[in-house]
Structures are given as structure tokens and as C-alpha cells.
Amino acid sequence: MASSEKLKALQATMEKIEKNFGKGSIMKMGDDSVEQVEVIPTGSIALNVALGVGGYPRGRIIEIYGPESSGKTTLAIHAIAEAQKAGGIAAFIDAEHAFDRFYAAKLGVDVDNLWISQPDNGEQALEIAEQLIRSSAIDIIVIDSVAALTPKAEIEGDMGDNKVGLQARLMSQALRKLTGTVSKTRTTCIFINQLREKIGVMFGNPETTTGGNALKFYASVRIDIRGSQPIKDGEEVLGKLTKVKVVKNKVAPPFRKAEFDIMFGEGISHSGEIIDLGAELGIIKKSGSWYSYNDTKLGQGRDAAKVCIKDNPELAEELEGLIFEALNKK
């Protein structure tokens, strides 16, 4: 077949596909209609950089997992706050029935305009999530957590009943349905997951996430979050240093890491990130234990410098602008 005939046949096929499945259902990668990745910021400058595209990609499934009290829900709540700041609509599927509206409000969430569901079982949770995503009205949806998505058969059965693989099958079926819908509606779908230990593993990492393997495959981004050393004022623990690793990334290079402070009752410490990244990029000078910017002394010690940045919003904004400028040049 001649080249011109091939192109005609391809064009006719493309028109037929678009007629049946809608405009944009197939496109050439070089076309103008293939856009740059749209994102929702994470609420952390360091994590935005680690993700490579400036935040959580839209139209993708994200998994955030880690041990208990590592900051998984905090990270998801920050994403909701960022989406709302940009005028987006957010939903929270609270399968754990543990959502704290007062903590969410402190992190910047407009709780009065947040859609929340506390479903009775896993099937109901995922069905509600699918319908919300299918509406095309939701910008971000968080499911907290996969471990709490208990199948209806397990809830209605007796305590000792063995229901092996039910949750894994439920997740696999749900994700097959959700993936295409999430992509078409440009919704960011975040699943929070817990860690378990495999029994009898002698070599390698015994840790695994709940809900089977489906989420590992369908997620475009997987984030491993771990609490590190505590942040103290004398004997009082005020927060913890948190380490994050992007273990899977389909939109940018994976395995990048980020560190930030999570302060109890406040969430991610913005001032702490400005100090750390500013010092790393040479914007903030460190001489001994003193931190300074131009001729302004920020404080002796990191904690004092953090307080200075927190108390001066204009200075924080100026430094943040310089940090973004320096990072974009990299």
C-alpha cells in the first residue's frame, strides 16, 4: 500500500474512532493537543521537586503508604487544601471513620466545602468514589484507607470466617473501572495505604501494602512516607522530621527523595522547608549556627530561623520566590 493510501486509511479510521468514542480518544504524541502534565501541588516544596512535575499529576491514581502515624493523611489533606486554593472541588472517602475536621481546617482545608463520605463497606466506598469521579466535577478525591475497605461479605460474615483474597479482588475490579474514568475526567485520585509484614520472609524486605497487587500496578505515582527523628523543645515533642521517597513515577524519573518537618497540629512546616532549601541553594547563608539572608540575621540555630521566617510572611514569600527561581534553573 502506498504511503498516501496508508495515511488516508489511517485518517478514516481515526475519524471513525473519534465518532464512536469521542474527540481526543486517540491522538499523535506530537500533536499540540497533547498537553503538559497538569498537577495539584503537594503542599511541600521539596516533594513538588521530588515528583519532577511540581505536584500530583491530574488524571492519575496516586498511592501514599507508610507505617502508622507517619503523616500519610496529613500529606493527603495538604493536597486537598492546595486544590481548594486553586478553586477546585475536593472529596474525602473516610473508610476509617477517623477524619478530624479541626485538624484539616488548621492545614488550610475549607471544611465547609469539602465533600465527605463515611461508607459502611468497601464496595460502597469505591462505588461512591467512582460516581463522584464520573461526574467530572471533582478535582481531587482521597480514599482513606485501602486497609479499611472491608468487603461486604466479610462484614456480614462471622468473626472467624476465612475470606481469603476478597479485598484484593475488590480492589482489582474497582481499579479496572476507575483508571479510565480518572484519566478522562482529569481527577487526581489518592489512595492512602498501610504497611503489613509478610510472615516467614527471611531475605529481602518483609513489608508489603494491603489490598493485593492491583494498586501497585495501576498507580502512576507511589509515595513511601516515614517519620524520622522527633523535633523537640526540651522534653516536649513538637513534631517529627519526615522522609519521603517516590518509589514509582510514570510522569518523571522515580526514586527521588524529600525531607520536611511535620509539626503536630500544624502539618508540613513551610518555614522549615524555606530554611533547608534556601541554605542548600545558597540563598540563605549559614555561618556556624547563624542563618542569614543578605544583611538580615534570621536566627541562631535552625529552630530560631524557622520562627523568624514564620513571623515574617513577606520575607517568607520573597525567599520562596527565589527558591522556585533557583530550582527552575536546575
UniProtKB/Swiss-Prot annotation:
PROSITE patterns: RECA_1, RECA_2, RECA_3
InterPro entries listed in its UniProt record: AAA+_ATPase (IPR003593), DNA_recomb/repair_RecA (IPR013765), DNA_recomb/repair_RecA_CS (IPR020584), P-loop_NTPase (IPR027417), RecA-like_C (IPR049261), RecA-like_N (IPR049428), RecA_ATP-bd (IPR020588), RecA_C_sf (IPR023400)
Keyword Glycoprotein: no
Keywords assigned: ATP-binding, Cytoplasm, DNA damage, DNA recombination, DNA repair, DNA-binding, Nucleotide-binding, SOS response
GO cellular component, one term: cytoplasm
Pfam families in the record: RecA, RecA_C
Compartments reported by the entry: Cytoplasm
Amino-acid biosynthesis as UniProt keyword: no
Molecular-function GO terms, alphabetical: ATP binding; ATP hydrolysis activity; ATP-dependent DNA damage sensor activity; damaged DNA binding; single-stranded DNA binding
Residues reported to bind ATP: G66, P67, E68, S69, S70, G71, K72, T73
Major subcellular location class: cytoplasm
GO BP term, example: SOS response
Domain of life: Bacteria
Similarity-based family: Belongs to the RecA family.
NCBIfam families membership: tigrfam_recA
Alphabetical list of PANTHER family matching this protein: MITOCHONDRIAL DNA REPAIR PROTEIN RECA HOMOLOG-RELATED, RECA
Function of the protein: Can catalyze the hydrolysis of ATP in the presence of single-stranded DNA, the ATP-dependent uptake of single-stranded DNA by duplex DNA, and the ATP-dependent hybridization of homologous single-stranded DNAs. It interacts with LexA causing its activation and leading to its autocatalytic cleavage.
Protein name: Protein RecA
Gene name in the database record: recA
